[in-house]
Amino acid sequence: MHVLSGLKKVFLVAVVVILATSCEKEEFITGYRGTIEFGEGSCIPGIPESARKYEKFNGRVYFVEKSAADSLGEPGFLRLKLKSTSVEARNGKVNVELPAGTFVIMTEKYFVNDPEFTITLSKGEIVQKDFKIWVCTSF
């Protein structure tokens, strides 16, 4: 009887440890929180902002160090993605821990090194900002 009781306690402790360690860490000190919307279309003629249609982005979002994006440019996009922090956006929502620094926010398919999509984080700061990323499919 005591052996069975001991096994129940061990099992219960194991379950609690597994549950505690498998939970996602949502609180952090330095990082980014926001919503990312994405749209694409012809830019001939240019589509005014008010006429553009955006959707909440679902997919991988990369936080590329600005200095690396500036030096490697679009030809180095694959290497930049491999070295960058990335998270999966769901219904546009992004919540990510980042080190202090300056980052350009890019989606999986498009290199968009634009000041409009750049964030600068100081240690201990969480930037909360929403972005609308528009990609021209023709010029």
Q: What does each model-found stretch correspond to?
A:
Residues 90-97:
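Short, surface-exposed beta-strand/beta-hairpin micro-motifs centered on an aromatic residue
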